[in-house]
């Protein structure tokens, strides 16, 4: 059974002790450290990811260039050829439909699923909130899903303030039924899955320019910096969540988003907080 091919997750440090952390985990570690220092403002911790995980993304209009290809004898290939990975331009057809009358004038918040709102496992979890059957290679497997504390309050308030979109790098066969159970209020106006991501240098990236919304009015909430590498200035990072039932990350975010909903554009407030 190829579980990781169905669900896109970060590694739970409890299950992988002794492994040296990679760059993609630095943001999570930074948030863990700040979690222990609750005397500091919760808002300032959102932006530690930009300080400790400084990924320079290529401009959307420019190709991404890798180092020259080297032959086995150490020489460069003919013409010093380089691998060029183009960053896709906005498509003729955007990922989201037109804004509804209900959401007219609201900002768009893109919300991740795994380790942001829930944690899922193919291993049995005694206190699972949901058990979702998923078909893999003709066999039905059970996925055990834990809800992050305060996710219900968070989603309900976000649905009142914003046009909310679920955007996950996991496959729809798993994520869609989880969203059915999680979102009892119809908060998510749209759901985007792995096929809507851009595969860039080994990561599934959520390219916000493909949504069809003005970028100055788009926010992404995600535990993985690789997911928003094209638009880090639009991100509100969150700590990866696995099973800590005392976690208050989502609850702490609500006042922040209440303030953000009143801003003319997201960059001004995010920039101010980043430089506090």
Swiss-Prot record:
Catalysed reaction equations from the record: O-phospho-L-seryl-[protein] + H2O = L-seryl-[protein] + phosphate; O-phospho-L-threonyl-[protein] + H2O = L-threonyl-[protein] + phosphate
Residue numbers spanned by region Disordered: 1-25
Sites where the protein binds Mg(2+): 112, 114, 223
Pfam families: NIF
Assembly mode: Interacts with REST. Monomer.
Site (Transition state stabilizer): 168, 206
UniProt keyword list: Hydrolase, Magnesium, Metal-binding, Nucleus, Protein phosphatase
Catalytic center residues: 112 (4-aspartylphosphate intermediate), 114 (proton donor)
Organism: Homo sapiens
Localization per record: Nucleus
The protein's required cofactors: Mg(2+)
Residue stretches making up the FCP1 homology domain: 102-260
GO terms of molecular function: metal ion binding; RNA polymerase II CTD heptapeptide repeat phosphatase activity
Tissue specificity field: Expression is restricted to non-neuronal tissues.
Name of the protein described by the UniProt record: CTD small phosphatase-like protein
A GO CC annotation given for this chain: extracellular exosome
Function: Recruited by REST to neuronal genes that contain RE-1 elements, leading to neuronal gene silencing in non-neuronal cells. Preferentially catalyzes the dephosphorylation of 'Ser-5' within the tandem 7 residue repeats in the C-terminal domain (CTD) of the largest RNA polymerase II subunit POLR2A. Negatively regulates RNA polymerase II transcription, possibly by controlling the transition from initiation/capping to processive transcript elongation.
Keyword Mitochondrion included in the entry's annotation: no
GO BP annotations, alphabetical order: negative regulation of G1/S transition of mitotic cell cycle
EC number: 3.1.3.16
Root EC class: hydrolase
Details of cofactor binding: Binds 1 Mg(2+) ion per monomer.
